[in-house]
């Protein structure tokens, strides 16, 4: 209990502001990161140049700035999510577009919830689990105390979380067969020998084929989910 409270305080100190003011803080960090040409900037620039090679330099530079801004906001959202009460987190979601998931409470089939991972997966998962229990898999964090804290937070609403391995995949199939919902991020890196190499923008990339496999074997519908904050109030 003491360790849990210590970890929660640690994450709170790293995200002392509400999301609205926190985004302003994140945007200032973005300017610093761009000015210093940090590692995240270098990697994002390489990826954008590959994916948008046909676009002009001005377009790619603009996209780079927006990408870094979204990434840093995502980090802050995760820290915020890991240190706030459920009441505060519920107030952070201002609007839900297309309430399909909310209308599927009485069903006899499973659902595959697929996140584009454009923002914080933890904040999105937290919102989902206020509606129903969700089974999800995640790559374990190397620091044991941090890993246990994050796992407990993701399970606090009654949802099940398993590591990205054969056991975790088996649990996803079982949950779908029971008519429950499972959640995954589109860019989730599979464990060794559990993924495939596919061509992305002319390059071989190690990625997951679990999502189409889950769908083909269970016929569970795939629901795409994402978080957006087009302004400081969202």
Functional labels for PLM-detected ranges:
Residues 1-115, 147-152, 156-158:
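Membrane-anchoring hydrophobic helices of lipid-metabolizing enzymes
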Residues 82-234:
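Soluble catalytic domains of membrane acyltransferases
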């Amino acid at each position: 209990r003491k360790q849990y409270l210590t970890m929660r305080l640690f994450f709170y100190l790293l995200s002392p502001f509400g999301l609205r003011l926190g985004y302003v803080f994140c945007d200032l960090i973005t300017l610093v990161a761009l000015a210093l040409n940090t590692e995240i900037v270098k990697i994002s620039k390489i990826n954008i140049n590959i994916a948008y090679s046909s676009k002009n330099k001005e377009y790619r530079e603009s996209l780079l700035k927006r990408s870094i801004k979204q990434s840093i906001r995502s980090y802050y959202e995760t820290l915020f999510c890991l240190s706030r009460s459920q009441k505060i987190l519920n107030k952070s979601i201002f609007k839900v577009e297309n309430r399909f998931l909310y209308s599927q409470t009485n069903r006899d089939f499973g659902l595959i919830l697929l996140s584009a991972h454009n923002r914080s997966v933890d904040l999105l998962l937290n919102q989902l689990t206020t509606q129903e229990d969700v089974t999800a898999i995640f790559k374990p964090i190397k620091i044991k105390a941090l890993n246990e804290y994050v796992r407990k937070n993701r399970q606090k609403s009654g949802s099940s979380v398993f590591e990205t391995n054969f056991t975790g995949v088996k649990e996803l199939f079982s949950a779908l067969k029971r008519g429950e919902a499972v959640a995954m991020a589109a860019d989730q890196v599979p464990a060794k020998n559990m993924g495939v190499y596919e061509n992305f923008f002319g390059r071989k990339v190690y990625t997951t084929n679990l999502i189409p496999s889950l769908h083909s074997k269970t016929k569970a519908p795939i629901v795409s989910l994402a978080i957006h904050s087009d302004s400081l109030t969202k």
